[in-house]
C-alpha cells in the first residue's frame, strides 16, 4: 500500500486514540487513490471552476503603494464562493467522503468560514453536516452561524475551555471517534493528525499555482515575496506549495501578535511557542512552563489558534519560510486602508498579511519589489467587530 510521509522534518505525525487509526488509514488510501483517478480530479476541477469560481483574480493595488517602488498584487480568494479560500479544500474533502461512502460530515470552525464552506459543500453534495463552534466564536460571528443553518447544517456550541477554536477541534475529534464508520471529519486547516496536513495542502495548492501563472503573464517574472496570514496555515501553505522550490521567492507567513508579542495575548506559536503534542500532531504550541496549553488570542477568530500546521513548522526550522507577526491594531489599520484605498473589504485574518506587506513597501520606499499577498477571505463577517472597536476608540 502506498504511503504518504507522516512527518515534515520532526513535525507532524499521528497522535490520536488507537480507535481513529483505521479511519485515518482509510482516508490516506482514499486520497492516494483519488489523486491517481482522472475522473476524481476532473470532478474536483469542474466544481472549483463552475461552482466556486476559479481561477480567482490577481489584482494590482493601484493606490496602496503610492510613493514607493513596490508593486503589490492581491490573490483574490475573497472572490471565491463562500467568501474565503476554505471552499477549495472543503470541496475536495467532501468528494473524498462520498468516495469512501460516508453520509455525514463533522467539522470545526473558528471564524465560521470553514463551517460555511463545509455547509455549502454538504448542501451541494447531499451530505448531512454538523459543525462544532466555540460559544465565544458563535457570539462574535453570528452572521456565519445563520448562514450555516440556512444551508442545513447543525451548529453545536462548545462551552469548554476558552470556548474557541481549539475546544471545537477537540469536540469534533471526540465525535469522530464515536462515528467514524459513517462520518468523515472534514478538518479545516493544514494541521491535525496525518494525513490531514498533506490532504489540505494538496487541495489548496491551486492558489499558488494560479498565482505563479498569473504573475508571469502580468509581470514576466516571479514575485520577490508571497505573503499570507498563518493561523493553522492552510491559505499560506496553499500559496507557498508551488513556490517552495523557487529559491528566489521569499515565503512570508504572518502570525497574529494580538495585543503585542510581549504580552500573553497573541497567537504566534511559531516564534513564541515550544514543541508539543496537540490536536493529533507534534508542532509548535503555546504552552506554559508546566506544559499546559496557553490560550491564544487574536482580534481575528480565524487566527485564534495556539498551534500551527507541521509543514510551516518545518519550513521555519530549515529557514525556507520566514514568519513575522502583526498586532490587532496594525491589522485593523490595514483593513481600513484597503477598504478606503482600493474598495476591497478584507477579512481580518487577511489584513494581517496585508499589514506586513505594507510595512515592507513603506519601510523601504526606494526598493523595487514585486509582492503578492494572499487575500484569503472577504471581510463581510468582520464589519460588526471592526465597527465596535472603532466606536470604542472614538474613531467613528
Swiss-Prot record:
Pathway recorded for this protein: Amino-acid biosynthesis; L-tryptophan biosynthesis; L-tryptophan from chorismate: step 5/5
Descriptive protein name: Tryptophan synthase beta chain
Any one annotated GO CC term: cytoplasm
Catalytic activity: (1S,2R)-1-C-(indol-3-yl)glycerol 3-phosphate + L-serine = D-glyceraldehyde 3-phosphate + L-tryptophan + H2O
Assigned protein family: Belongs to the TrpB family.
GO function terms (MF aspect): tryptophan synthase activity
Record lineage: Bacteria, Pseudomonadati, Pseudomonadota, Gammaproteobacteria, Vibrionales
A family per Pfam: PALP
Quaternary structure and interacting proteins, as annotated: Tetramer of two alpha and two beta chains.
InterPro entries: Trp_synth_b_CS, Trp_synth_beta, Trp_synth_beta/beta-like, TrpB-like_PALP, TrpB-like_PALP_sf
Catalytic class of the enzyme: lyase
Amino acid at each position: 500500500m502506498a504511503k504518504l510521509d507522516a512527518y515534515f522534518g520532526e513535525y507532524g505525525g499521528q497522535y490520536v486514540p488507537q480507535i481513529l487509526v483505521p479511519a485515518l488509514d482509510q482516508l490516506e488510501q482514499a486520497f492516494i487513490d483519488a489523486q491517481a483517478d482522472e475522473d476524481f480530479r476532473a470532478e474536483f476541477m469542474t466544481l472549483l471552476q463552475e461552482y466556486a469560481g476559479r481561477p480567482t483574480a490577481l489584482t494590482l493595488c493601484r493606490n496602496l503603494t503610492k510613493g514607493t517602488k513596490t508593486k503589490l498584487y492581491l490573490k483574490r480568494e475573497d472572490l471565491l464562493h463562500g467568501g474565503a479560500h476554505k471552499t477549495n479544500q472543503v470541496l475536495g474533502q467532501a468528494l473524498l467522503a462520498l468516495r469512501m461512502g460516508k453520509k455525514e460530515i463533522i467539522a470545526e470552525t473558528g471564524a465560521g468560514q470553514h463551517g460555511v464552506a463545509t455547509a455549502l459543500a454538504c448542501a451541494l453534495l447531499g451530505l448531512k453536516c454538523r459543525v462544532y463552534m466555540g460559544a465565544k466564536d458563535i457570539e462574535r460571528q453570528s452572521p456565519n452561524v445563520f448562514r450555516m443553518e440556512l444551508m442545513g447544517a447543525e451548529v453545536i456550541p462548545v462551552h469548554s475551555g476558552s470556548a474557541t477554536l481549539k475546544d471545537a477541534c477537540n469536540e469534533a475529534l471526540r465525535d469522530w471517534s464515536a462515528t467514524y464508520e459513517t462520518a468523515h471529519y472534514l478538518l479545516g486547516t493544514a494541521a491535525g493528525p496525518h494525513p490531514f496536513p498533506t490532504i489540505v495542502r494538496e487541495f489548496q495548492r491551486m492558489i499558488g499555482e494560479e498565482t505563479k501563472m498569473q504573475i508571469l503573464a502580468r509581470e514576466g517574472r516571479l514575485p520577490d515575496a508571497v505573503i499570507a496570514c498563518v493561523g493553522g496555515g492552510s491559505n499560506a501553505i496553499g500559496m507557498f506549495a508551488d513556490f517552495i522550490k523557487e529559491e528566489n521567492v521569499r515565503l512570508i507567513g504572518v502570525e497574529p501578535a494580538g495585543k503585542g508579542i510581549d504580552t500573553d495575548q497573541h497567537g504566534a506559536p511559531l516564534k513564541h511557542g515550544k514543541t508539543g503534542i496537540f490536536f493529533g500532531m507534534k508542532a509548535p504550541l503555546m504552552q506554559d512552563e508546566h506544559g499546559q496549553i496557553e490560550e491564544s488570542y487574536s482580534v481575528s477568530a480565524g487566527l485564534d489558534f495556539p498551534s500551527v500546521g507541521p509543514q510551516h513548522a518545518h519550513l521555519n526550522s530549515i529557514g525556507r519560510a520566514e514568519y513575522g507577526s502583526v498586532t490587532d491594531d496594525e491589522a485593523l489599520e490595514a483593513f481600513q486602508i484597503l477598504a478606503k484605498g482600493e474598495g476591497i473589504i478584507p477579512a481580518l485574518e487577511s489584513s494581517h498579511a496585508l499589514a506586513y506587506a505594507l510595512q515592507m513597501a513603506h519601510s523601504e520606499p526606494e526598493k523595487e519589489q514585486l509582492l503578492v499577498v494572499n487575500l484569503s477571505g472577504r471581510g463581510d463577517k468582520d464589519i460588526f467587530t471592526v465597527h465596535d472597536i472603532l466606536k470604542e476608540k472614538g474613531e467613528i
